[in-house]
A protein has these predicted regions:
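Loop-helix junctions at membrane interfaces
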Residues: 1-169
Length: 169
């Protein structure tokens, strides 16, 4: 006997949203511009928290880095950064999730600042032990202020997307 299991409309919508947000997060790095890529990926993380919940957002925050490493699109010197990138995305997601009900911007700024502080601390202290000085310096710059800027731009982009979606309803 064959048993057919049907998905509800809400389950189908959630799967479609997850797939769409994941696809955007995976393809954004192909733009090869940290400001654009980081802003898009962070916007996806904020949107995922709001539309799918924090567990799905954490998965979306982890998968692009892992896929980039496996597919060869991530430069080899950045592969040791993957755990730090995934952790910083989880920090952004957790802080935003915890504070978003108080106020969207309180959650967005808290998540952005904590993500930046984590990556800044990691780059300032640890990277000199992993890479030669020249490579460590360039990676430290990438993990510095651009992380805060792209997280805040991502929050703004997500907010504008939400406003646009609500105006279409």
């Amino acid at each position: 006997m064959i048993r057919i299991i049907a998905l509800s409309k809400n389950q189908i919508i959630s799967i479609a949203q997850f797939g769409t947000l994941l696809a955007i997060a995976i393809f954004a790095p192909l733009l090869h511009n940290q400001l654009i890529t980081g802003s898009i990926v962070n916007a996806v993380l904020f949107l995922a928290v709001l539309t799918l919940g924090w567990p799905s957002a954490v998965a979306i925050g982890a998968l692009p880095s892992l896929i980039a490493a496996v597919s060869g699109t991530l430069p080899a010197p950045l592969i040791p950064m993957i755990p730090f990138i995934i952790t910083s995305n989880a920090i952004l997601i957790a802080a935003f999730y915890l504070f978003k009900n108080k106020n969207y911007w309180v959650g967005a700024v808290a998540g952005s600042v904590l993500k930046f502080l984590f990556l800044y601390s990691a780059s300032a202290g640890l990277f000199n032990f992993i890479w030669p000085q020249k490579i460590a310096a360039s990676i430290a710059v990438m993990m510095n202020w651009p992380q805060l800027i792209t997280a805040l731009l991502g929050a703004t982009l997500a907010y504008l997307c939400l406003k646009m979606i609500k105006s279409l309803d």
